A protein has these predicted regions:
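N-terminal small/polar loop signature for handling phosphorylated ligands or for N-terminal nucleophile
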Residues: 48-94, 178-224
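Glycine-rich phosphate-binding loop
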Residues: 7-8, 12-13, 27, 80-93, ...
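Phosphate-bearing ligand-interacting subdomains
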Residues: 1-46
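Ser/Thr/Gly-rich flexible loops in soluble cytosolic domains mediating phosphotransfer, phosphorylation
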Residues: 34-49, 53-54, 101-136, 140, ...
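Gly/Ser/Thr-enriched, mixed-charge loops and adjacent short helices
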Residues: 94-207
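Phosphate-binding and adjacent anionic-ligand microenvironments
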Residues: 208, 225, 245-413
Length: 413
């Protein structure tokens, strides 16, 4: 979970560090800060390490690495938690992500508990406690490369004719290139930030696959066969391939993935459960269920597996085999104070046998489904509807958006 924006200069790094340590050292004993490169980030990292050590916590400096490598390192090296520092583009601000021992962000009640202790927790006296130990861990990136190489099934060979264009996070590009280039793929980096221009560039350069990746949130845009591939389509294809290859027989999927895709994957023999769609909660649920599939969560693994499916001729086969579901979405403004009342009234108005309460409220109807959930800023409700019938999908969106709007406007309800 993002603790907030840290601006080096307004608060000293040591003061930021002290406040973080006061709240977190009890819960996070063996701690691994990682991923900084700008001078301000390096200063903040060393201040955090100094504060942790002064409070008796052991700290492992994982150096500079991508977010997926950081998550993998937390799990592989057995740390109790971690802190990922990413500096902003302006070099004066950045964000800190706190992770637990599963390598996933602290969210919800876990974050609120940390935040509360951060504000009120006592500093343990250093005179009565041991000083922590600082360890330099230099193998995080190489360990993650080995993980990706095990995931890849291609053998080292000459050029295979497949060109992959990757934009966005440079660490994602570097990790993917280190795996795919020796296997004969052509891997290029796109320096722009606009997904639409990525599509144009991929078309102009006759690129087979193109991706816009964020190192923390995953693949934001995927292009193959001259068209955009939605994140749900890509996730469904990768999950289907893993089941058919015998790499997975149990999966955890996000609640907002179309039910038609879930049914098709389940028909292949997979045991499937659903969970909230937020990446950190989804990843944690998959890890706890023993159903973690790297390509569903790690952008590097996602790109590598998609490239290999393309090379094998299976990507198009799986994409063409997906049910043709049309998804529409609308937003209904709603005050955060009214969120609970509106959702409760909405749920009470639907038949019990039609609803699923996983990530908001999902209503299953005869020819489709509707998912109602708050947006990330808790300023509106998202109404997402899906159906084989495009017109019916739009109609569902309009009808349920109207229901929510009426409830939100009825202050007496």
């Amino acid at each position: 979970m993002r603790v907030g924006v840290v601006t080096v200069g307004e608060d000293s790094a040591q003061e930021v560090c002290d406040r973080l340590v006061q709240g977190g050292v009890e819960a996070i004993w063996s701690f691994a800060p990682g991923r900084v490169e700008l001078p301000q980030g390096v200063m903040l990292k060393h201040a955090v390490i100094a504060g942790l050590v002064s409070q008796g916590a052991d700290a492992a400096d994982m150096g500079f690495c991508g977010y997926s490598a950081f998550e993998h390192g937390i799990r592989a090296f057995g740390y109790r938690g971690g802190m990922y520092i990413r500096m902003g583009d302006d070099a004066h601000s950045g964000e800190i992500v706190l992770c637990d021992g599963t390598g996933t962000e602290l969210t919800g009640s876990c974050f609120r508990a940390f935040q509360q202790e951060l504000k009120t927790g006592a500093v343990r006296p250093i005179t009565t406690e041991r000083l922590g130990i600082v360890q330099r861990v230099s193998g995080a990136a190489k360990s993650y490369d080995a993980h990706l190489n095990r995931l890849a099934q291609s053998v080292r060979s000459g050029p295979n004719g497949v060109t992959v264009l990757i934009g966005g996070n440079p660490e994602t590009y570097d990790a993917v290139a280190r795996v795919l280039l020796p296997c004969g793929y052509s891997v290029r980096y796109y320096t722009g930030l606009d997904s639409d221009k990525l599509f144009e560039t991929a078309k102009e350069e006759n690129t087979d696959l193109a991706f816009m990746a964020d190192g923390m949130e995953g693949v934001m845009c995927a292009i193959a066969y001259g068209k955009h591939i939605t994140r749900h389509e890509l996730n469904a294809v990768l999950a289907m391939a893993a089941v058919k290859d015998g790499r997975a027989n149990k999966l955890v999927l996000p609640a907002d993935i179309p039910g038609e895709y879930v049914k098709q994957i389940a028909d292949e023999g997979a045991e499937i459960s659903v969970c909230p769609a937020k990446r950190s909660r989804w990843a944690r649920a998959a890890i706890e269920a023993g159903a973690y599939l790297p390509e569903l969560f790690e952008p590097e693994a996602k790109i590598i597996r998609a490239a290999e499916l393309y090379l094998a001729g299976k990507l198009k086969e799986y994409l063409d085999g997906l049910p043709k579901v049309t998804i529409n979405e609308k937003k209904v403004p709603c005050s955060w104070r009214d969120m609970g009342r509106v959702l409760r009234s909405f749920t009470e108005g639907e038949r019990n046998e039609q609803i699923q309460l996983v990530d908001g409220v999902k209503v299953n109807v005869d020819k489709g489904w509707v998912l109602v959930r708050p947006d990330s800023g808790f300023t509106a409700y998202r109404v997402i509807a899906g159906s084989f019938d495009a017109e019916y999908s739009k109609e569902l969106t309009d009808v349920y958006a109207g229901k929510l709007r009426a409830i939100a406007e009825d202050k007496e309800g």
